[in-house]
Amino acid sequence: MTDQELEKIRNYLNKIFNTHDFIVKKRKSIEDSCEVYHKEEFLGLIYKENEEGEEDYQFHMTILKDDLTKF
């Protein structure tokens, strides 16, 4: 993903969730996705999809069973 795409994704997340705490980072050797953080906490990955000329982005978040027991 380009720096411009990363910035747009970050701005979108911050606007939708009414915060300024999202961070979007490039992945080291993978160009079709980025890492999403809220403050310092890793949340998941966003993948860029291109199907039949349509570009979209998919968010993938894993929630560990152990994390759910904390609540």
Segments and roles (model prediction):
Residues 1-71:
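Terminal leader/tail segments of proteins
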